[in-house]
Amino acid sequence: MRERANVDASEGAARAATALGAGGQTSARALEGLDAAWRAMREGGKDGVDGFARRARGDAGTRGGGDETAAYDVAVCGGTLGVLVASALQRRGARVVVIERGALVGRAQEWNVSRAELESLVDAGAMTRADADECTMIEFNPIRCGFYGSKGEDVVTTNILNAGVSPERLVRRCRERFEEAGGTTLERADLRGVDVYDDAAVLNVGEGSEPIRARLVLDCMGFRSPIVRQIRGNRKPDGVCLVVGSCAEGFPEERNESADLIRTVTDIEEDYRGQYFWEAFPASSGPTDRTTYMFSYMDAEESRPTIASMLDDYWELMPKYQNIGSVDDVRMKRVLFGLFPTYRDSPLKTEFDRVLAIGDASGIQSPLSFGGLAALLRHIERITGAVEEALDCDALDRDALRE
């Protein structure tokens, strides 16, 4: 299959990431795993998790729930984006620990945001303006929108998703700022459960490690978070955005100075695939390097396509979209794919004291501009301000966190 061959070929040029989201994964094994998760959503009744977060009676200190001297104000679970919030909170005076199941590093593929959105990290205190400049690898304008069969002209705008940000630099700089301020990072920590006591939450981070005590747990583990899956149970999402794409070298340099925010090049697809939309951005890795995404919105009925089959459609349609002869005319650097489930009751309301979902875990992502970094940036000042206030007032019960 073409999709498998190209994914495998790209692995030498890209480290496989673990985050699920737009461009969040690159390996053939990750494609199989994501399609399995998507299949479980479509089939229903197979995606829930039981007992990961539990209510426990009494105080943690009297129940063997970790060493009181190691207590934190906030435990951030999921560090790739969580470290951004952690850095802001730590620099505001909270005692914060970041728990990451793998190595806390950013992926190779650039994130596209606006400079104004990136500035929100500076305003929140997560990083300096010099850090933001260092992380911005490329900027471009104009940004276009256009639709297949339309007799009108393209809609042209500027300064929307027009900055390519290096995740590797962004995560590294926020981590450095976080740790400089006294924050603690736990890498390769296997979070196995959360027990919520009257006075603290206790996090089990695997055999041979002391439990972590925190007044508040921030779940930044994405839509596949075990806490999110426990709360949502086996409920199907109300809608899903599936996305596939690649970063490739060899596009005409003279046409690689602007971007597409949204474009269509075909009518609605048959076989329950919906309407294919496209995005394209110049990449900083070279003057002929370009990232293209193809995405579609749909429900989670069993008849909907696999992500692998959408990737096959991508290989067929991308040359038409980019006005090149064949996909073989460019050299693949990374193949990208992800999905975003959406629910009518988002943002997700917590079912537990001392546990709050943020980022994609909360369901606040926007499928048009995708989730991940952009979704978090738009809310980071509100999140950090609200968490700081909740800690100051000790308003950490379920009802308070739902406000």
Model-based region annotation:
Residues 103-147:
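N-terminal FAD cofactor-binding segment of flavoenzymes
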Residues 1-73, 92:
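Extreme N-terminal leader/targeting segments of oxidoreductases
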Residues 72-73, 215, 353:
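Conserved acidic residues
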